[in-house]
Amino acid sequence: MVGTRPEAIKLLSVIRALDASAYYEPLVVSTGQHYKMVQDILDLAGIACEVTLWSGSRQANLNARVASVMERFEDFCAERFEVHSDRTPNEEDVLQGRFPAAVIVHGDTSSAMAAALSAFHKGIPVMHVEAGLRTGDIRSPFPEEMN
């Protein structure tokens, strides 16, 4: 899950390592936060983006953007995988590609928080890269430090 150019750059090696593995089939999902910049980085690396979750107006407020990412991720999971709230996946579901093994998010952006929360609500394990870096000031940077 990538939202910003720095996230895309930092996750390239993770995406490539997963792609080289015999055990995983990484699907790159963009939250749409920095759509063009993320797409440019992925294009340079030869990595395809499966879906962009938010393509709304840049004038939309933060709550609307977070809600859009969460709703679109839920829709994507229901369409691409057998992710439904009425059943618990098992190991066979993951091995057969019917359920994601995990969602990897990076950093402290609101789009990363939205994607992680949506995955958590669907029972998908969340791996958080670069978690825990703090400034100690809840208002700076805003809203990332609160996320």
Annotate the PLM regions.
Residues 23-72, 76:
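Conserved nucleotide-sugar phosphate-binding/catalytic loop shared by glycosyltransferases and other
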Residues 14-26:
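A short, Lys/Arg-enriched amphipathic alpha-helix followed by its capping loop at the start of a domain
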Residues 1-2, 7-17, 56-147:
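Active-site and donor-binding regions of nucleotide-sugar-utilizing enzymes
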